């Protein structure tokens, strides 16, 4: 096992750890989840470019008779990337004291403003930053609004 294989194995472990954390662990952090909203996927083109670049490396590895382990690790990296970018959907978890957005917990007390843009994007203004939340179902914006009014 050379340095490339070790680096690829580390990358795969980190990607799988993120996938498990995002899918299973976040739901149980900071108390009970009262509302869970699916968000629109982002960065599809970036993931496609990443997959194409890895495929180029796989092709190069095969043509120079590189290690089979490296080829398998690269192909597994592509599979995990497909899962993270195209199969898994990002979620917004509303808890008692705040919500998880992009795997970051944000307390309700940090919210200074809330606006809805014309194209259906919820803009939440924090102390020094704005969050642009794009939901997959437009009806979810009403559910978010009702939940925040009732529980804030």
From Swiss-Prot:
Its main location: membrane. The keyword Transmembrane helix applies. It is a multi-pass membrane protein. Pfam families: DUF986. It is found in: Cell inner membrane. Keywords: Cell inner membrane, Cell membrane, Membrane, Transmembrane, Transmembrane helix. Belongs to the UPF0266 family. This is UPF0266 membrane protein plu2700. It comes from Photorhabdus laumondii subsp. laumondii (strain DSM 15139 / CIP 105565 / TT01). The lineage of its organism: Bacteria, Pseudomonadati, Pseudomonadota, Gammaproteobacteria, Enterobacterales.
